[in-house]
Structure formats: C-alpha cells, structure tokens
Amino acid sequence: MTTNDMERSKIVESSDTIEAIEECYRMGWSDGLPVVPPVDYKVREMLEMAGLTGEEEIISLEMRNRVLTSENVAANAVMAGCLPEYFPVLTTTLKTLEEEKNFVHMASASTSSPAIMMLLNGPIRDEIGANY
C-alpha cells in the first residue's frame, strides 16, 4: 500500500455531519458529488447484509495494484448512498468483474470508448425493487 493509499483509507472521526462531509471531499473520496459519511455503523450494516466481515477480498485491480476488501466496497457504497439490501448485488457484480479481468483492464486502459454493461435479472431484481 502506498502512502497515498494509506492516507485515502484512514478513518475520520467528527461529531459534525457537515464537517465529516467536507473531510470526505478533502480526502479525495468524492469527485464533488454529494456523499454520505461512511460512519462505522453504516459500513457494518452493509457488511452484515451480505454476511461479510470486512476482510474478504472482493476484487483485485491489478492494473492499479489495488485489492478491494469488502470493507472498502462497503465504505464506498455508503458514501454513494447505496441501501444495505443492494449491497449483496454490488459485491456479486464486482466478483463477476474479477472473473473478466482482461475486459476490465481493456475498458479502463483504452483510448477508445468501450464500456462495461451489466444486467440484473431474476428474483433479486424484484426483491430490491430494481427498475425494469
């Protein structure tokens, strides 16, 4: 883990919600879009919904020399406003991308315009209320 990675994964504590949001911006955890501060209890709620501990490796991004753990993914999901009941779908989606490493690398390294498209189908679609 580089110094930059260590800095980006630090835990921030604040009793002021607005200050916590501003710290997310200062840490580079957002590109300017609104965020929900990834407070511990919200991250744990995500992990519990998927039956995860926070230590599991969800996906390895070799082109960026990064490994995303379930805790990393949960914190980002909280910041994006993801509901806990969606989190198992999110982790499954990322694990699917792990199986298609070559395509993920090609899509992220291309100077063209490839895109990754995923479809959600089956009973889970109705269970979480996804549009179709």
List the model feature ranges, each with a label.
Residues 1-112, 116, 130-132:
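Alpha/propeptide regions of enzymes that mature by internal proteolysis
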Residues 120-124:
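Short, structured patches in soluble enzyme cores that scaffold and shape functional sites
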